[in-house]
């Protein structure tokens, strides 16, 4: 049961980190997956926070949003594979914004 309690704390801290760093890009959550322990209590064993990765209309906004997506995705001390995947979307959005901005100048 101590392992479930630790997992619950870790999962909640992980998702909270996404929320705190995700100003303006977090769309939902945290949503948790629960497991019942031998004591009959629910323990969070997984979770997710929705992050808006859709492009904006202006290059400057895409740069800003891409940076914020990366910050939100990589905020936990132990990013998951999904977190790294979302961060890559942020990198692409930021890069595209920078390319579009340089073409306008």
Model-derived segments and spans:
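Type III/flagellar secretion export determinants
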Residues: 1-105
